[in-house]
Amino acid sequence: MSATPEKADDLIVVGKIFSVHGVRGEVKVFSFTDPIENLLGYRNWTLRREGVVKQVELVSGRSTQKDLVVKLKGLDDRDEARLLSGYEICIPRSLLPDLTADEYYWYQLEGLSVINQDEQLFGKVDHLLETGANDVLVVKPCVGSLDDRERLLPYTEQCVLAIDLEAGVMRVEWDADF
């Protein structure tokens, strides 16, 4: 494990260390990938928390249904592992697999202006939630938005009509009163 002074500009958060596992320095990880095991395909991670950035190498990992238990190179002690709790796990954007024309990574949707069929600006996509049935867009008001309401919109084909990443716009079929 090594610290690095490099700024992590083009990194994507793909998981988070939330606890320790056992006494041999393993850590528990919540993976943001789908399926969660995809995180284990990236061997070199950048860990980030409150301005501190560390480079680590994944040695091994396994799934425990809801999360992962991983072993990092040079981390052999429970107390040392505990210090990594709360760190985000990041990888370079360039390592993400290419998607088809109608697929998007969550990070690409965050910040898009959300406009309904009546040309009303609801706000901007702040983040997404995974609910099981379908993902949910959390849209927060911004300058020029219709009102000051936060909206939760289903990320489904019925609701999301079009996405234009270059224009920074997502068009939705959603009534302003919902």
Curated annotation (Swiss-Prot):
GO terms for cellular component: cytoplasm; ribosome. The keyword Cytoplasm applies. The keyword Cytoplasm applies. One of its GO terms (molecular function) is ribosome binding. It is found in: Cytoplasm. Pfam families: PRC_RimM, RimM. Keywords: Chaperone, Cytoplasm, Ribosome biogenesis, rRNA processing. Its main location: cytoplasm. GO terms for biological process: ribosomal small subunit biogenesis; rRNA processing. It comes from the Bacteria. Residues 101-178 form the PRC barrel domain. SUPFAM superfamilies: PRC-barrel domain, Translation proteins. Transmembrane segments: none annotated. Belongs to the RimM family. HAMAP family: Ribosome_mat_RimM. The PRC barrel domain binds ribosomal protein uS19. An accessory protein needed during the final step in the assembly of 30S ribosomal subunit, possibly for assembly of the head region. Essential for efficient processing of 16S rRNA. May be needed both before and after RbfA during the maturation of 16S rRNA. It has affinity for free ribosomal 30S subunits but not for 70S ribosomes. Binds ribosomal protein uS19. This is Ribosome maturation factor RimM. It comes from Pseudomonas fluorescens (strain Pf0-1). The lineage of its organism: Bacteria, Pseudomonadati, Pseudomonadota, Gammaproteobacteria, Pseudomonadales. The gene is rimM.
